[in-house]
């Protein structure tokens, strides 16, 4: 994929083409796919871990 910026900088030509940088998380996902996990699996596991570590609200907050 290529990102094209129009008039991003006055010193540059009208079209400036940039290659997006891959993020570290994608590299980790590719590494874990050999273990049978997809990137969606890893994101769901991360979300589940986040929810499990969230503090629960105290009961009867309204009254």
From Swiss-Prot:
Would the keyword Ribonucleoprotein turn up in this protein's UniProt record? no
Could you tell me the gene encoding this protein?
virE1
Pfam families named among the record's database cross-references: VirE1
Q: Which UniProt keywords apply?
A: Crown gall tumor, Plasmid, Virulence
Ranked from the top, the taxonomy reads: Bacteria, Pseudomonadati, Pseudomonadota, Alphaproteobacteria, Hyphomicrobiales
| Remaining remarks | The Ti plasmid contains at least six transcriptional units, designated vir loci, which are essential for efficient crown-gall tumorigenesis.
Kindly provide the name given to this protein in its UniProt entry.
Protein virE1
Q: Which GO terms describe its biological process?
A: protein folding
Record note on quaternary structure: Forms heterodimers with virE2 that prevent virE2 anarchic homopolymerization and binding to DNA.
Organism expressing this protein natively: Agrobacterium fabrum (strain C58 / ATCC 33970) (Agrobacterium tumefaciens (strain C58))
Instruction: Report the function annotation for this chain.
Output: Involved in DNA transformation; controls virE2 polymerization and prevents virE2 binding to DNA.
Q: List the disulfide bonds.
A: none
């Amino acid at each position: 994929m290529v990102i094209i910026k129009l008039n991003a900088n006055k010193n540059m030509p009208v079209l400036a083409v940039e290659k997006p940088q891959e993020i570290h998380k994608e590299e980790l996902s590719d590494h874990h796919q050999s273990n049978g996990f997809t990137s969606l699996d890893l994101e769901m596991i991360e979300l589940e871990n986040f929810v499990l570590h969230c503090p629960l609200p105290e009961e009867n907050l309204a009254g």
